[in-house]
Amino acid sequence: SKGKHAAIGYNKRYLTVVDKTVATGVTLTDARWENKFTAEFQGLYRNFQLSSQYYWSHIAREVGNSYNTDGFYVSARGIVVNPGNYKYNFAGSGVDNPDNKNLEVMLGYGYLNLRDGDAYAKNKAAIAAGLPGVDLSKAGRMSDVSVGLSYFLNKYVTFRLNYHFVTVKNFDLEKKNVNVLQARV
């Protein structure tokens, strides 16, 4: 059916609330419907934790010009000082903080792909033919390698220090590498 449909947008900012710069993103107009799928894994063994998630989205648009996105992350954590066991919280569907005065080490990797090459080629052809297109210049791939330390003073107070190496490659823009150091209480 012809007519006005919804716009669906995906945006990923860099890892700070101070700088609101969008690292990669896409807004798709004339979206008719969207399918989403996600699978998550949470593994605990004593003082080690492994978490991962995969997500995928398919957006059907007018004239069959669909768009696909996907991504995943994986993180491994371990309590290295005052090792205590991680405990799964069934009510909150997550892992409780470790006991008092524990030091945790974290390694992680995340990947986001907003870059659908087939849709990009069709979009460029449509624009060249004088048909309406969408701005895909900021649609791209983003990866994040992270290392962190968390000190759990008690159940309510945690000190965190994280380092992230973020790489962003959008369709029409230069590749960017960004180093982020975060300290949080």
Language model features with spans:
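Outer-membrane beta-barrel pore domains
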Residues: 2-185
